[in-house]
Amino acid sequence: SSAASDVYKRQAINSACKGIKSVGLCHSVQGTAEMLAKDLNEKIEDIDYLCAGINHMAFYKKFTKKNGNGGEDLYPKLKKLADDIVSDKITSTRSIGKDSESDKVLHEKVRYEILKRFGYFVTESSEHFAEYVPWFIKQNRQDLIDQYKIPIEEYIDRCENNIKLWDDLEKDMTPIHNQPLKRGKDYASYIMDAVTNNNEVTINGNVMNDGYIDNLPSNCCVEVPCLINSNGNQPQKTGRLPEHLAALMRTNINVQILTAEAALTNKKEHIYHAAMLDPLTGANLSIDEIYAMVDRLI
């Protein structure tokens, strides 16, 4: 299933292989925080947040503006923004112009709808998050896809454009000659700096759930704040998630655990089980159709 995050599968397999130190990385937490800051016309430097969950389905338990007095809760403003974005009165700042990789306008109605219904903002983009739940992409429901402005096959366009970019660079590297080096926003360089030079940093990393989120399974991979320094990676306990958020995550955790189980045990039947339990797949296909789809894929 396209919905099951690959980060969990890799972490589960790594945890089964003793002696491998690893942390799963994704840029959706910091990227979404920056988008929300822009949508609120705030500076990201003034934002403080606490985000926890699973990869591509983590939620901001706290999203505040620093003010020296405990912080201003920005969720009331975000919820007002959600009403305006879902009703097409305004768009997210992410939707201004076409995406540089897929060449499509990427709307954020899905995530703001989720904020309205669940009360918290999720980390993964609308076009991808719609693949994790059964409510937005349905066969013979073009009206829903149009309503939420979901760019179907956007990732295929993104990959094709990136492949063309790499092919062009292979033929001619002059466009990137003398290109200035600039540190990106992904975590890897900050982790190396923290471990090597003890320049302490907190990231959101993916680790097996060793008590870090109380109401998610212990054999799942969670995305939580991680303190990194010369002592290595120290994931932080975040307590319990709101039960409705944990319930939503478990629908995808089921798929992730079974997919990893198939790889670890070499039992093909668990791939069918994972596909049958995938929320979007189950909302669109019968059991026979799911089995046939899996057979075509493998």
List each language-model region with its residue ranges.
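Short, small-residue-biased leader/transition segments that mark boundaries at the very start
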Residues: 1-8
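An acidic- and aromatic-residue-enriched active-site/binding cleft used to recognize and process polar
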Residues: 5, 27-28, 52-54
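Generic structural marker for isolated residues within well-ordered, non-membrane alpha-helices
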Residues: 10, 33, 294
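Short, surface-exposed basic-aromatic patches at helix termini and helix-loop junctions that form
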Residues: 10-21, 37-44
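Acidic, His- and aromatic-enriched active-site or binding-groove loops in soluble protein domains
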Residues: 18-33
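Long, compositionally biased stretches enriched for glycine and/or charged residues
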Residues: 37-298
